[in-house]
């Protein structure tokens, strides 16, 4: 064979054997998925358990090694439970996450995830090594009788020249043998650097900064089981434990930052001279050790609004479809919620035959708007919070001070619920954001003596205008695009 199928099978029926033969001998299935990452594996299992025949394509089935996709919010854990995949969080040395620890110039505030009811157990997220989690999801896909996992590199989409409908995927194996895989529906889930996005997505990712990451060994965090956000005069720093002995640190470095320029010694010099002094003392020894080992890696921080699918036979999902700044760790939560939504919309009860292109297209149009119930809050919050936490002018810094003061007053349940993917109401985000803005104005007014009231008033107007500029563009994108 041109490619290497890897399958796990339960008790088979004759019809299942026929479907498997169709996948393996004729390279044909109901659904072909490009990318056996977080979303691709979850979708393959979800559709396979509905009785759909699925071919899952992945260029390399080796364990991936990434510095993002390591924090799953409680809302993502809940979506994983709906998919019957929560056990994928076990056996990978994952660490419970109970909320956030925000430090503003070394003044900390804990922000626990809110309980649904006083008698309920507190919601819990998980941190882990990304690769270990993906391998567990791949095991689940391989164990699904209706799914065939094939290690091969997708190179192009097979398209009907008359109707422009996508019919399948052209691939090349490690032995450089070409093959095509056909399905009624082709799913592109090949990540942030998608090679198929450009032809079928109207938007281009916008990169504002990069996260530079190190893995710290046996460091002591100020507040275990909490994601740490460190705020200062510099861009935000994230810390969270991903294993018994490992802690991830991500340092946001905006583009063209002078202290990280080659002239000033590059990123490593920025880490040593700017980042190190701002870290908690308990973290500094492990940070120095990791920095000396030279394990610095980076990922772009991108923003990409979603777009309605218009190509028959194709759906783009995951980071190939929609990205937001990873500051809030919401990417996988959006992905799993998307899988839940799409699974429900494409269920055999609603779409008996995925070859019914007209009905599938109608459901995909519905999917674009239905997914926003979970995705919009996370997308808007990620972009707005990054603007505040990476404040680079006096008005954004005023909003940053107001935001931290808001947390200090104990008004954390709403923000924590939004961050955790537990509250999926944009109206709640709107109320909290402008409550922060109004509190920022009060804090700003108190910083000036009465005789400078005209100056303070002008700065209040500019600060409120800045708040509107921060959030309204993203709210409009989510509402109308």
Curated annotation (Swiss-Prot):
Its EC number is 1.14.14.17. The keyword tRNA processing does not apply. It is a multi-pass membrane protein. Its cofactor is FAD. GO terms for molecular function: flavin adenine dinucleotide binding; squalene monooxygenase activity. It is found in: Endoplasmic reticulum membrane; Microsome membrane. Keywords: Endoplasmic reticulum, FAD, Flavoprotein, Glycoprotein, Lipid biosynthesis, Lipid metabolism, Membrane, Microsome, Monooxygenase, Oxidoreductase, Steroid biosynthesis, Steroid metabolism, Sterol biosynthesis, Sterol metabolism, Transmembrane, Transmembrane helix. The keyword Membrane applies. The record marks 100 as: Important for enzyme activity. Pfam families: SE. The chain crosses the membrane at residues 28-48, 425-445, 452-472. Belongs to the squalene monooxygenase family. In Aspergillus, the biosynthesis pathway of the sterol precursors leading to the prevalent sterol ergosterol differs from yeast. The ring system of lanosterol in S.cerevisiae is firstly demethylised in three enzymatic steps leading to the intermediate zymosterol and secondly a methyl group is added to zymosterol by the sterol 24-C-methyltransferase to form fecosterol. In Aspergillus, lanosterol is firstly transmethylated by the sterol 24-C-methyltransferase leading to the intermediate eburicol and secondly demethylated in three steps to form fecosterol. This is Squalene epoxidase erg1. It comes from Aspergillus fumigatus (strain ATCC MYA-4609 / CBS 101355 / FGSC A1100 / Af293). The gene is erg1.
């Amino acid at each position: 064979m041109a490619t290497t199928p890897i399958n796990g099978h339960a008790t088979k029926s004759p019809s299942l054997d026929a479907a498997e033969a169709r996948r393996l001998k004729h390279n044909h299935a109901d659904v072909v998925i490009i990318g056996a990452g977080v979303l691709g594996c979850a979708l393959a299992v979800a559709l396979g358990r509905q009785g759909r025949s699925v071919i899952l394509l992945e260029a390399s089935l080796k364990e991936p090694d990434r510095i993002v996709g390591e924090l799953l919010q409680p809302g993502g854990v809940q979506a994983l439970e709906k998919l019957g995949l929560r056990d994928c969080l076990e056996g990978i040395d994952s660490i419970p996450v109970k909320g956030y620890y925000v430090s503003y110039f070394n003044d900390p505030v804990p922000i626990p995830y809110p309980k649904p009811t006083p008698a309920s157990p507190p919601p819990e997220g998980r941190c882990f090594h990304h690769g270990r989690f993906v391998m567990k999801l791949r095991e689940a896909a391989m164990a699904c009788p209706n799914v065939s996992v094939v290690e091969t590199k997708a190179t192009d989409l097979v398209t009907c020249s008359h109707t422009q409908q996508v019919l399948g995927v052209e691939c090349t194996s490690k032995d450089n043998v070409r093959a095509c895989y056909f399905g009624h529906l082709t799913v592109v889930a090949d990540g942030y650097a998608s090679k198929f996005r450009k032809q079928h997505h109207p938007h281009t990712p916008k990169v504002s900064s990069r996260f530079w990451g190190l893995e710290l060994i046996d460091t002591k965090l100020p507040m275990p089981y909490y994601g740490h956000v460190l705020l200062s005069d510099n861009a935000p720093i994230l810390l969270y434990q991903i294993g018994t002995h490992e802690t991830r640190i991500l340092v946001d470095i905006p583009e063209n930052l002078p202290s990280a320029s080659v002239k000033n010694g590059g990123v490593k010099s920025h880490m040593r001279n700017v980042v190190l002094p701002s870290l908690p003392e308990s973290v500094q020894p492990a940070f120095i050790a990791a920095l000396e080992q030279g394990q610095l890696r980076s990922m772009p921080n991108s923003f990409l609004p979603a777009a309605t699918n218009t190509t028959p036979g194709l759906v783009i999902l995951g980071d190939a479809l929609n990205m937001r700044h990873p500051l809030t760790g919401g990417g996988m939560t959006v992905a799993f919620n998307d899988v839940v939504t799409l699974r429900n919309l494409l269920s055999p009860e609603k779409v008996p035959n995925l070859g019914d292109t007209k009905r599938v297209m109608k459901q995909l149009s519905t999917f674009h708007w239905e997914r926003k119930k979970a995705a919009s809050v996370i997308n808007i919050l990620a972009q707005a919070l990054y603007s505040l936490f990476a404040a680079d002018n006096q008005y954004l810094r005023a909003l940053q001070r107001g935001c931290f003061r808001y947390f200090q007053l104990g008004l954390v349940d709403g923000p924590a619920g939004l961050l955790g993917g537990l509250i999926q109401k944009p109206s709640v985000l709107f109320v909290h954001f402008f409550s922060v803005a109004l509190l920022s104005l009060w804090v700003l007014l108190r910083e000036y003596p009465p005789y400078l009231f005209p100056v303070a008033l002008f700065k209040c107007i500019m600060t409120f205008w800045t708040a509107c500029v921060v959030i309204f563009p993203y709210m409009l994108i989510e509402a109308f695009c």
